[in-house]
């Protein structure tokens, strides 16, 4: 009803989606679909927190350790980090986003914590989304304030070549 009534008044609805993490009370934590559904599944014995430093994405000389800690670490103990490198997790997230577009008729997606999810998975998701819905509105939250860092995440950016995020719009 919310979307139908909003559309009747000329209001568009943008849904906030989060592919990076979920809450610790989610059913997936209590009954994991597979052992690598999350990054750092042994978090109770060996918790790894993200470094919150996005520079390993843009630094070609960043160590694998720094990149892994930033990308695979959890925000906090209450926010399990989803493993988008797992093909089942990835496919679920893609299908779930398509379901919301088709079922609920949402007008756009704001992707929360875009850089903290797996880069290749997010790039592929955007590619699939753009192929299925070429004019769809999607914006990625990057959590960076410098224009050059923000531009790195933009689709077809020369700064991130040969990689391509396929993300049409970014915000800090």
Model-identified regions with their sequence ranges:
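Conserved nucleotide-sugar donor-binding subdomain of glycosyltransferases
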Residues: 93
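Long, low-complexity, polar/charged, intrinsically disordered or flexibly structured peripheral segments
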Residues: 63-71, 78-83
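The substrate-binding groove and active-site-proximal loops of carbohydrate-active enzymes
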Residues: 1, 24, 75-90, 107-116
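Aromatic- and acidic-residue-enriched segments that line the glycan-binding/catalytic groove
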Residues: 19-67, 127, 152-165
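Short, flexible turn/loop "capping" segments at secondary-structure junctions
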Residues: 72-74, 102-103
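Active-site-proximal helices and loops of the catalytic beta/alpha 8
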Residues: 3, 7, 21, 29-30, ...
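Aromatic- and glycine-enriched glycan-recognition loops and surfaces
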Residues: 1-15
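Short beta-strand segments at enzyme active-site cores
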Residues: 13-17, 110-111
């Amino acid at each position: 009803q919310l979307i139908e009534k909003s559309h009747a008044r000329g209001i568009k609805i943008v849904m906030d989606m989060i592919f990076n993490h979920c809450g610790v009370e989610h059913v997936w934590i209590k009954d994991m679909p597979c052992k690598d559904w999350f990054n750092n599944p042994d978090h109770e014995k060996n918790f790894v927190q993200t470094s919150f430093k996005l520079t390993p994405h843009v630094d070609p000389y960043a160590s694998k350790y720094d990149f892994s800690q930033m990308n695979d670490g959890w925000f906090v103990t209450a926010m399990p980090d989803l493993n988008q490198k797992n093909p089942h997790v990835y496919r679920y997230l893609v299908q779930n986003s398509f379901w919301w577009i088709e079922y609920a008729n949402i007008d756009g997606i704001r992707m929360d914590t875009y850089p903290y999810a797996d880069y290749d998975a997010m790039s592929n998701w955007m590619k699939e989304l753009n192929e299925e819905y070429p004019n769809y509105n999607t914006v990625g939250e990057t959590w960076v304030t410098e224009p050059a860092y923000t531009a790195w995440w933009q689709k077809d950016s020369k700064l991130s070549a040969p990689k391509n995020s396929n993300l049409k719009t970014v915000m800090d």
